[in-house]
Amino acid sequence: MLELQIKDLCVAFNGKEILHNITFDIENGAFIGIVGPSGAGKSTLLKQINRLDPSKTGGSILWRGKDVDDYDVHELRRNLAYVFQKAVMFDGTTEENIKLSLKYGNEFKPEEIEALYQTVLEEASISQDILDTPAQDLSGGQQQRVGIARVLLMGSPVLLLDEPTASLDVETSNKFCQTLKQLKGGPAAKDGKKRTFLMITHRLEEAKFLADKILMIESGHVVEYTDC
């Protein structure tokens, strides 16, 4: 089953071409590592997928056969969840920060939520002893796990990861990648289909460790899309 189809996507800003005729397909359950030099258009591509960037000049992006422009934007972003380089922590405890995602719509019954919450904590490698800790006091790696836990609790079937390890040291980055490795191929809580990941990284070794396929972008062009 195709999860995403990007067809002849073109993006320009202030007359400058950012992405040129980007075309590729992503199967449900795949983990795609996106690599390339700074300024190549990697983040622009991810932001196009869940409509965070309005600069598209041509082409289309289909999620499960339907153009992303035809979805309600809130529904789209609940399903195609964006995880930024540094997860935003709000005032409150770690638990309160994770459960914020429950305010933005889900399809779970009240009696299902606690069981799902416990599963998410385990999947995101969040220990019970930090749940009462102010989220802003957590380490960088712990905060990134909280960011992942939020989207897992929403049941988002597609995770768009924009350099989630960029601000982490090597040891913390390796631990975070192990967490992602465990999530890879797992069922999305919302619909039972497998989770699909697109992750930008500047570290080729991370892409090879995690990904099924690597998409290389240079100067707004796809120069390689290959199995790992």
Predicted region positions:
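Catalytic Walker B motif of ABC-type/P-loop ATPase nucleotide-binding domains
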Residues: 159-163
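Helix-to-loop junction immediately C-terminal to a conserved catalytic motif
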Residues: 50-51
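Conserved ABC transporter NBD signature motif
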Residues: 58-67, 76
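Conserved ABC ATPase "signature" region
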Residues: 111-130, 178-181
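Conserved ABC ATPase signature
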Residues: 134-138, 142
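Hydrophobic anchor residue at the start of the ABC signature
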Residues: 148
